[in-house]
Amino acid sequence: MQTSNTDYFFQSTAQLENAERKRLKSKNSNGEPIKLQSKVLAIAADPTRGDAVFLAESSGTARRLVLETGESAAVYKGPTAPLPCICLSTDGSTLYAGCWDRSIWSWDVKSRKPGHKFTGHTDFVKAVIYVNSGGRNLLISGGADADVIIWDVITGSRLHVLKGHTHKIQCLAADPIARAEGSPLTIFSASSGQGIQSFSITPSLGDTVLSDPFKVHETSIYKIFFDEDGDLWTASADNIARCLTRESGWKSETALEHPDYVKDIVVDEARGWVITACRDEEVRLWDRATGELHHTFSGHFEEVTGLLVLGSKVISVSIDATVRQWPLDPKEIQLAKAAEKEKEAGVEPAPEPAPESMLTEEEERELDDLLNDS
């Protein structure tokens, strides 16, 4: 392949071949891609409507996307640095996004006007969740500074800073069983270390104590996800996704092996699937009961960064700047398999060129380090 792009002269043969592979793969229309202008780093459900999602992007933009039409129903601006995490208030009225600028931005969903800007972390904000404890709505964030901060959503002030983590926080998740049984709200945290820790939020907040970590992986844990049974699913840079059962004291009962970093994991309760996102660009569908790989959805041409089960589909987002939708109904999956075989014998029409990055070369390297921090 001949090119006038001087960047090619500084790349190895393997790098050039990989770039060409991605260029060719970017032409596919698998998963009905919705194309955006910047890398998608996180996804969250819209609590008020089932056909829309919220996205956090590397450009510093958050948006509300209607999946059926591909229309951006609302765009939320202000940050000038990437947004690695996103969440909404329980009633869906307020949007929150953690940012590289060490703060958490908020917007009124309907008016798109900025709200409180939560400042207090000393490094990237990598995880943010909205919870209710004792009748009080709280925002909880985790950062690359290894701190967990509890915020007052009304005033935007810090209520408590939880120290004790020794590694960068990657993910936070609220324990649904403790909350349902009336016990104090318990939050689990995963980090760039090897373990998972937890803490219960007491009325005074000052009594909040971090548990000792329990080791389940060999390196960074990118995502933790509670299923309806209260068991904990994990995704890690050691190329394994695990199910840690509550009854066993959080021991691994299921291990799903991948060829590369596992970036996200979700469970489809209705149909018994476990879905994983991988750095190798694939979305994998596993049988929850047997732990066997059932199908691989191939379409993204860069790392898959997030997943969301929405009705009978799983939505995936990627740093290839696309949002894709994959079927979860067994009959539709069989049709997808058949269609995939047919495409292997044909040539797909070339779509629009992949959008160019809005980040500088240095920012691209920093973003890659952030996404694959192990």
Which sequence ranges carry the predicted segments?
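WD40/WD-repeat beta-propeller blade N-cap
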Residues: 33-40, 76-83, 118-125, 163-169, ...
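Structural hallmark of WD40 beta-propellers
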Residues: 50-54, 74, 92-96, 105, ...
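Short coil/turn segments within WD40 beta-propeller repeats
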Residues: 59-63, 81, 101-105, 123-126, ...
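Terminal intrinsically disordered, low-complexity extensions flanking WD-repeat/beta-propeller proteins
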Residues: 1-24, 261, 292-296, 301-374
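Short loop/turn segments that connect beta-strands within beta-propeller blades
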Residues: 67-70, 109-112, 153-156, 201-205, ...
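A short helix->beta-strand "capping" segment at the edge of beta-propeller domains
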Residues: 10-39, 69
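Loop/turn segments within WD40 beta-propeller blades
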Residues: 43-50, 69, 86-93, 111, ...
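WD40/WD-repeat beta-propeller blade-loop signature
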Residues: 30, 39, 49, 72, ...
